[in-house]
Amino acid sequence: DMYDEILKQGSKIVDGLSSYRQPVFVHIPPAGELRGGSWVVLDSQINARGMIEMTADAHSARGGVLEAAGLVEIKFRADRQRATMLRLDPTYAQLARDASEASGPAQAEARRRLEEREKHMAPFFHAMAVEYADAHDRAGRMLATGALRHAMPWAETRRYFYWRGRRRMMEVRYLHACLAA
């Protein structure tokens, strides 16, 4: 990336879009993802005039800085996973109580059973965490946070952009005419 000057070109795009005076439409198509630096470059909040509008497919588009699995690796480490297991898994909670109350060889056996249960349940809790994180990357959540203007099925996109483009161009034309007067 450094050799190809990707970051330098991305910053030029951000500079250009932040001062752009015409409407820009960004659409995430079905099964499309907008991640990482691309998300930052095309974020609708970088233009103070509100000229950038982001839309997405309502069913399968994803967007965000990190992928769900990467977010889980950062935010849901082993200690938090154990705390969640303790809160949600009654068997794990009982084994943890047994391990803390026991002493000597009984404590070693109780800890072994606790670790065994943790290893058994860890994949399930990891999968739930990834699904939860992925739910925050879907169109519904992006709409709720204001990152998207509209989420629509793929069949409606052509009609939507035709009419939205016409309206935005007229709005901009009238705005420039009023400012020039």
How would you describe each model-predicted region?
Residues 1-181:
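Ligand-binding clefts of soluble mixed alpha/beta catalytic domains
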